[in-house]
A protein has these predicted regions:
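Central "turn" residue of the DNA-binding helix-turn-helix
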Residues: 30, 119, 129-130, 160
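Interfacial/linker helices and their anchor residues that mediate assembly or domain coupling
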Residues: 44-102, 174-236
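A short, Lys/Arg-rich alpha-helix, primarily the initiator
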Residues: 1-14, 86-121
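Short, charged amphipathic recognition helices of the HTH superfamily
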Residues: 17-22, 117-124, 148-149
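Recognition helix of helix-turn-helix/homeodomain-like DNA-binding domains
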Residues: 1-17, 24-26, 39-43, 129-147, ...
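The alpha-helix within a helix-turn-helix
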Residues: 26, 115, 125-126, 156
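DNA major-groove recognition helix of helix-turn-helix/homeodomain DNA-binding modules
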Residues: 20-35, 149-165
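The DNA-contacting recognition helix of HTH DNA-binding domains
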Residues: 3-4, 33, 122, 132-133, ...
Length: 236
């Protein structure tokens, strides 16, 4: 069965699939288990979620990593995976809903879940080429609209999702000429690898990102990263 067909079927009737089978399927598809549980409409066990971390540190981490090109991202991902896994001092805690309004559509809830699986809220994401009001609308009631494919192209990369897969979950048609908007999934791979990291380890990783990207500080004004999607080796 094609990946797109599997993902669409999970959106339609994923609650009929046992969580253990979804974890197996996630490994087969190369998708984080927490993400596939969200897609299928299952709750994510707290042990699959990131530990509680400082939001300002998360924002700085995402910002600094977004300035790395593809070679630097690959090295940074290896750096993240080399860090020791630190056991949280207490039991895992599922975070409260982080937005002013609850999600009113299935895909809005899915998007919020995918973002939350990485320990982010809208505020911690790097520059995506979309306004904050648009992003908040997407986690409120993201319905089909004329800009939806553009919005999918913007969010897929930081989530570490391939465009065809996220398009399938959104039940949008995908064509091979579509490209990520600002960031490709190589940035999202670092964010996904960093899910288990503590606040201190995120600070360490952000410093390593600066060292590799040679990003310069500009005082109070900090220019956003324009991304490296145009150089993604997956889109020759």
């Amino acid at each position: 069965m094609e990946r797109a067909t599997i993902l669409r079927s999970l959106v339609a009737s994923g609650t009929d699939t046992a969580p253990w089978r979804l974890v197996e399927l996630a490994a087969e598809l190369g998708i984080p288990a927490a993400d596939l549980l969200v897609v299928a409409g299952h709750p994510v066990p707290a042990e699959l979620l990131p530990p509680e971390r400082d939001a300002d540190v998360m924002r700085q981490f995402a910002y600094r990593v977004s300035h790395c090109d593809h070679a630097q991202l690959a090295a940074l991902e290896a750096f993240v995976r080399s860090l020791p896994r630190v056991t949280a001092p207490g039991p895992p805690v599922r975070p409260a809903w982080p937005y002013p309004r609850p999600a009113e559509t299935r895909f809005a809830a899915t998007l919020s879940g995918l973002i939350g699986n990485r320990g982010f809220t809208i505020r911690e994401l790097p520059f995506l080429g979309l306004s904050l009001s648009t992003l908040y609308g997407m986690v409120w009631r993201w319905e089909p609209n004329r800009y939806r494919r553009q919005q999918l192209r913007a969010v897929a990369g930081p989530l570490g999702w391939a465009l065809p897969d996220l398009f399938a979950v959104a039940d949008e048609s995908y064509s091979a000429e579509l490209r990520p908007m600002v960031h490709c999934h190589h940035l999202g791979r670092v964010f996904t690898a960093a899910v288990p990291l503590t606040t201190a380890q995120l600070i360490e990783t952000a410093k390593e990102a600066d060292r590799r990207s040679v990003r310069a500080d500009h005082g109070a004004w900090q220019p956003v990263s324009q991304g490296f999607a145009g150089e993604c080796p997956d889109f020759p």
